Amino acid sequence: VPYIQYDEHQAMAQWRDLNQSRDWTAIHLLRNGKRVEANARHCPATMALLDRLPQPDIPGAGPNAMFSLLAPNTTIPPHVGVNNSRLVCHLPLIVPEGCWFRVGAELRLWERGQAFLFDDTIEHEAANPTDLLRVVFIFDVWNPALSEVERDAVRRVIGTEGGAEGL
C-alpha cells in the first residue's frame, strides 16, 4: 500500500512525488490502533514481540507497526510528526550500503539489525540512493517520560473510536 495517500485537493506539496506512489509503501501490521489481520497473521513472532512492548494504545490513533519499503533511488523528504507522546522505533532489516536516515542534525547510515528510537516531532528524512530495495520495521512505543496519568490524558485528547489519522 502506498504510504502517502492524500487526496489531490489537499495541499501537501512536499509529498507530491510520493503521493499514491509505489516508491514508498508499507505493509501495516497495526494501523491507527487496529490490527491488520491480513498482514499480522503472517508475522506471529513479530506480533508477540509487539504485545510485550509499551505501545501507545490510543483508540483510533495507535499503536502503529509496519514494514516500510523504500524503492531504489527514492528519498523521503524532510517532515515532522504531530506529537511526542510516543517515540518511533526503526529496525533496519534490508538496508543496502549507502541508505541513510537523518533526525535533526544527526545523519546516520542504516545498519541491519541496529534499532533506534527517536522523537519524530524532530525533522527527519530518509534516502535509498541505491539500486536495491530498503526495508525497515517501524513501530511506536509510549514516550517513557509520560506517567500513566499523562498517558490517560493523551488517550482522551487524541483518541477517537471513529479513527483518527494516526499519531
Give the residues covered by each predicted segment:
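Fe(II)/2-oxoglutarate oxygenase catalytic core
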Residues: 1-66, 70-83, 96-99, 129, ...
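A short beta-strand-loop-beta hairpin characteristic of the jelly-roll/cupin
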Residues: 93-112
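Conserved metal-binding segment of the jelly-roll/cupin
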Residues: 109-123
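C-terminal SET catalytic tail plus cysteine-rich post-SET Zn-binding segment of SAM-dependent SET-domain
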Residues: 114, 124-128, 140
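Hydrophobic side chains in beta-strands
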Residues: 29, 69, 93, 103, ...
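Short, surface-exposed charged micro-motifs
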Residues: 66, 90, 125
